[in-house]
Amino acid sequence: GDLNQLVFKLCIQYKLKDTLLIVAGDCGFGFEKKEYYEQMVRRNAKRMNQANNWIVFVRGNHDNPAYFDGTTFNYKRFIAVPDYTILQACNHTILCVGGAISIDRIYRINEWNKRKYRVHSNESQENDIPRNLYWKNEAPIYDADKMNTICVDFLIDTVVTHTAPSHCELFSKSNLNQWAENDSLLLGDVQLEREVMDMLLHHLKINNHPVSHWYYGHFHQSWHSDIDGILYQMLDIMEFS
């Protein structure tokens, strides 16, 4: 979620040039005012231009989906892309689908309800996206129509999502059952989230897409495994692959 740190790792620590970096969600869009992110872009534009790098953001559950329409956050070197965006780079065709369930959503809703009056009284709403800590449209969506349209023009070899198919780790987020004690719909919603990824995978398989890599975040840990010819890679916070 820290754009400065991301650019530092990309351009200074790893000294990467001519590189497209795709962030697999939880960029932090929406916790601050829009102006904050615009400032980040201005602060890092020169460094990104000099290295000829780009960063594409896929939405996580710690992001306001309003930023991911392809226009709200769209700069020369930084863009937050809509679900079902296709990226073509370095001879790869990459499908991006964001979204996941926040297991701590009840806590975040309550926390916001405590804070919101104090926060909103200081904010001008004109041309701004209101801050929040939780967005109810955070879940991933399976869109068969978009997949069918994509299948006409593209052969996907790489997938970037925030969560993962149900046969991938982690099989359960830590403390999930604890959070579920006060959130009766949580376990079902989390299961549905993974099933959406299963449907995505199924669609790619039955349409003979040569998928070889699938990258995801969400679980704040590192793991990888080759399953049925696809290398699944779970990325930790700020982990590059």
Locate each region found by the language model:
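Adenosine-cofactor binding site in Rossmann-like domains, unifying the SAM/SAH pocket
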Residues: 2, 85, 99, 138, ...
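Core catalytic region of metal-dependent phosphoesterases/phosphodiesterases
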Residues: 3-90, 178-180, 186, 190-196, ...
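Short glycine-/acidic-enriched loop or helix-start segments at secondary-structure transitions
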Residues: 6, 32-33, 66-69, 106, ...
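Short, solvent-exposed loop/turn segments at secondary-structure junctions
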Residues: 27-30, 62-64, 99-103, 163-168, ...
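Conserved beta-sheet core of the metallophosphoesterase superfamily
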Residues: 54-58, 73, 167-241
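Beta-strand-turn-beta hairpins that frame and shape the catalytic cleft
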Residues: 86-96, 158, 226-232
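Active-site-proximal loop/helix segment associated with metal-binding centers of metalloenzymes
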Residues: 92-195
